[in-house]
Regions:
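Catalytic domains that recognize anionic headgroups
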Residues: 82, 88-594, 598-602, 607, ...
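Register position in tetratricopeptide repeats
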Residues: 564, 598, 632-633, 666-667, ...
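Canonical positions in the second alpha-helix
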Residues: 578, 611-612, 645-646, 679-680, ...
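Structural marker of alpha-solenoid helical repeat scaffolds
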Residues: 581, 615, 649, 683-684, ...
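Start-of-helix register in tetratricopeptide repeats
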Residues: 553, 587, 621, 655, ...
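Short Lys/Arg-enriched helix C-cap and helix-to-coil transition segments
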Residues: 2-3, 45-67, 93-94
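TPR-repeat structural position
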Residues: 568, 602, 636, 670, ...
Length: 867
């Protein structure tokens, strides 16, 4: 078993193992020396030869000091007692002096903190609540308090009037997950390692604001508006309650952008949680995603802000303001508003057409990185403050910790804003860092890094940029070439910041090594185009400047939007134009492949995903898409290889083992299906309803009905409306001979999912077997209504009409349709025999004989082929 270490212990060992001996480390942590040795092995912390030599020197010096101290103690024991008594008397005098006058001699920052805490009186800092709003995709210059006159945001404006508003707050990334990771760890993406949405995780060794507050006695909760911040990505660390609960089944397509909930659905569970917890001190985070596309605010905001697309964007922000007002009113009703810190901050903005970018994520201009930041503290002296100094969103966490009188961890890279809040303007010019790796990860173009202060903005790109943001706030005129000295200063500062802020020992996400045999097999199936990731090869080379590719980027986005709107022909035409201009854009290949999937052109889709992997063999999204396409095409060996590769690449993704379990279940290899489904559940228990349901189906095949029922009920606990669960419970009832209960379960499935054609079919067969032949007809009709190519459904409906001796001409048409759809399936002989019987009844003997012979011949053929 591994050594169990707390985060603080791990951090202490990492920071001190080179400078301190095992004895010193053990003494500090209060553990045995052997425990330290095992812990260092577990954390893979190894001292160099230099470290060991230095530790030996320290131990020698300490040994000499001990000997000298003993000699001195023997010689000067009386004198020592006399001196000690004087020291104690002086110390007591100093304590008395400090009690009355000490705050005037503290370091400046400590003075500010002490003054702030005095202003908060009679409230104690350690008893304040924190209500933390993150407003997704919200520009600072689209709020009333920031000078925008085309919108009404009275609640946010009032918070600014009663609090502190920062005019130059910069986000560290124009993407939701990296930005929120920075907000809640107080560190740069360079350090916490979350560089893009999806496929990145906030690692457990990173300390979050919620974790610190929970350790200090706060009840913690979070209420999330979009799947991009689902708990699976790691931001739930430290939260007692993390409300994500996204029902993925109700979305036609699942993407990080499309799975979202309206803000009213976010604050409703917050109100329920607060009703039970408002008498405790609490930290609650509310994430409002409404300002993100699509811009579709509810009434009256849709009508009030109907002036084009950007007007509807404002309408979404106005609606968010309304929701914030509802939350604040709830605090007042509970009489806790006066002891609650309110934070308003956006993760990033929205370009709205500036620099030819409509959304966000691609560029790092102020349109997407300059965000609102408002902090309202329960102090009248701090109302209405406006701070124009450059700050960063990573500064919020250390600021709150200082306000709450909690020590700030050493690895926090943000700076507390308490000094600025208390009026200190003597600090040196501050700089803010932003980055976007999105162009490189998705398109193979250059990443972007920027550095900003209150006067200039520098963007590191293949064609570097410098802007005078006072004279040119919309960054329209690049002054880089005419201001080389300023540009060089920013370049050096950016380089220094990136080197200093990067986490040591953490490499950027890259390919996982495979053995030679596995590599060759995967290459043969199209999963690997070469032995090195092209994204790795390109690092450091001159990649395309995103500025020069914005038109192609916009065409790709337009194709994605058309595809989402089921305008497949238009989407295909658009994305084909992009590929003709630049065949190496892996994301374009992905988009075209997904369009082919929707058109059921599986071979074309497979070819596209292979092309994407030729560009970047380690592009996980393309590997998944290729495996999924193989699965849809029933090329199961190829699909299995892909999903196994994905399990090696990302052991925390539950989708690959789920798909492997599904495939093996389809192949009736139940013993292989079960462990993969169990693995999927283990990885992501909160979203494991489908895996539990499939596991139930697997146990039905194994005749383990008790375990099957348990798994299906687990699925229903997680998702009460999950498809196929009641269908599977009906199968269990049938296996037990409980046919009446089986009918009830089938009917429940149909009530929840009227288009469930297999359930209609099974219920029809059950009615038939119970002698209720009339009842089977409507369900067989529903089965072929919802599944137009369901050959077996046509044949059994024809047989039902034959058995009832009615609609015989229609029965002929049904049988012929079933045979056309599947001329040589195991049920096809039945179709010919049905036709033979009908023709006999109609007196058409020759046709009857012909169909009978066809049925017998086909039956023999199928029998031989199965031997």
């Amino acid at each position: 078993m591994g050594i169990k270490l707390t985060k603080k212990q791990r951090r202490y060992l990492r920071d001190n193992f080179q400078q301190k001996s095992d004895v010193q480390l053990a003494k500090h942590l209060g553990v045995k020396e052997s425990y330290i040795r095992k812990a260092l092995q577990q954390l893979k912390l190894k001292r160099t030869e230099e470290d060991l030599k230095e530790l030996q020197k320290i131990e020698v010096r300490q040994g000499k000091k001990i000997e000298k101290r003993a000699a001195l103690k023997a010689h000067f024991s009386r004198k020592t007692l006399f001196i000690l008594s004087i020291i104690i008397a002086v110390f007591i005098s100093l304590l008395v002096f400090y009690h009355f006058f000490g705050r005037y001699f503290l370091p400046k920052e400590s003075q500010y903190i002490a003054t702030l805490h005095k202003q908060l009186a009679p409230l104690k800092a350690s008893e304040l609540n924190i209500l933390f709003f993150t407003l997704d995709t919200t520009r600072a210059d689209h709020l009333g308090c920031y000078g925008y006159d085309k919108i009404e945001t009275p609640n946010i404006d009032k918070l600014a009037q009663n609090g502190i508003m920062f005019q130059n707050a910069t986000s560290q990334a124009p993407l939701t997950l990296p930005s929120h990771s920075s907000i809640f760890t107080g560190t740069y993406p360079l350090y916490h390692g979350v560089r893009d949405n999806g496929g990145f995780y906030l690692e457990p060794d990173k300390t979050t604001l919620a974790e610190i507050l929970k350790e200090n006695g706060w009840a913690t909760s979070a209420f999330i508006g979009a799947f991009v911040l689902d708990s699976r990505w790691g931001l739930d660390q430290g939260f007692d309650y993390y409300y994500d609960n996204f029902d993925l089944a109700k979305y036609k397509t699942i993407s990080l952008d499309s799975v979202q909930r309206e803000g009213g659905e976010v604050i409703a569970p917050f109100f329920k949680w607060l009703d039970k917890n408002y008498q405790k001190k609490f930290f609650s985070w509310i994430h409002l995603y409404d300002a993100h596309t699509p811009y579709d605010p509810p009434e009256p905001y849709k009508t009030r802000y109907a002036n084009g697309m950007w007007g509807l964007y404002d309408g979404e922000i106005a609606y968010v303001d309304f929701l914030i007002g509802k939350v604040l009113d709830n605090l007042k009703e509970k009489k806790i508003a006066e002891k609650t810190i309110i934070v308003i901050v956006a993760d990033h903005g929205e370009s709205l057409g500036q620099h030819r970018e409509s959304g966000h994520g691609f560029f790092v201009y102020d349109a997407t990185t300059l965000v609102p930041l408002i902090i309202q503290l329960p102090s009248q002296q701090l109302q209405g403050k406006v701070i124009s100094d450059q700050v960063e969103i990573i500064d919020v966490m250390p600021t709150l910790l200082q306000v709450l009188n909690i020590s700030v961890p050493q690895d926090i890279q943000g700076k507390s804003l308490v000094s600025l809040i208390m009026g200190d303007n003597t600090e040196n010019e501050q700089y803010a860092y932003s980055e976007s790796l999105y162009p490189r990860y998705h398109y193979g173009w250059s990443e972007l890094h920027s550095l900003r202060n209150s006067k200039y903005k520098y963007i590191k790109a293949p064609k570097p940029e410098l802007y005078d943001i006072i004279a040119d706030p919309r960054e329209t005129t690049n002054i880089y070439n005419n201001n080389t000295s300023i540009a060089q200063e920013f370049e050096q500062k950016l380089k220094d910041l990136m080197e200093k802020s990067s986490a040591k020992g953490i490499e950027e996400k890259g390919p996982r090594k495979l053995d030679e045999e596995s590599m060759q097999k995967l290459m043969a199936l199209g999963y690997i185009g070469g032995f090195t990731s092209s994204s790795k090869l390109k690092k450091g080379e001159k990649l395309a400047d995103p500025k020069d590719k914005i038109e192609l980027f916009n065409k790709i986005k337009l194709a994605e939007w058309k595809s989402a709107d089921e305008q497949l022909d238009g989407a295909l035409e658009q994305i084909t134009q992009v590929i003709e201009q630049d065949p190496a854009i892996m994301e374009a290949r992905q988009v075209r492949g997904r369009i082919f999937i929707k058109q059921n052109k599986l071979e074309e889709a497979i070819a596209e995903f292979k092309e994407a992997l030729n560009v970047d063999p380690d592009y996980e999204s393309a590997i998944f898409s290729l495996a999924e396409a193989y699965k849809k095409a029933k090329k199961y060996d190829e699909a299995i290889a892909g999903f196994k590769r994905l399990m090696q690449m990302d052991a925390r993704d539950s989708k690959p083992p789920f798909n492997l379990g599904d495939i093996y279940l389809e192949l009736k290899d139940i013993d292989k299906a079960i462990p993969y489904l169990q693995k999927s559940i283990q990885i992501d228990p909160e979203h494991s309803a489908m895996a539990h349901n499939l596991l139930g189906a697997a146990y039905i095949e194994k005749k383990n009905l008790t375990q099957a029922e348990h798994e299906i009920n687990e699925a229903l606990k997680i998702r009460p409306r999950i498809p196929d669960a009641y269908h599977n419970l009906a199968l269990i009832c049938e296996a037990k001979g409980e046919f009446t209960k089986a009918i009830e379960q089938y009917k429940k499935e149909i009530e929840l999912h009227p288009a469930a054609y297999p359930t209609h079919f099974n219920l029809a067969l059950l009615y038939r077997n119970m002698g209720m032949k009339d009842e089977q007809i409507p369900h067989l009709e529903e089965a072929i209504k919802y599944k137009k190519d369901f050959a077996k459904g046509y044949l059994f409906l024809a047989k039902a009409y034959l058995d009832l001796n009615k609609n015989l001409e229609q029965a002929i048409n049904l049988a012929e349709e079933g045979l056309t759809l599947e001329p040589e399936s195991e049920y096809s002989p039945l179709g010919h025999y049905i036709l033979a019987d009908i023709y006999n009844r109609l007196g058409r003997t020759n046709e009857a004989n012909r169909e009978f012979q066809k049925g017998r011949s086909l039956e023999e053929k199928i029998k031989k082929s199965s031997q």
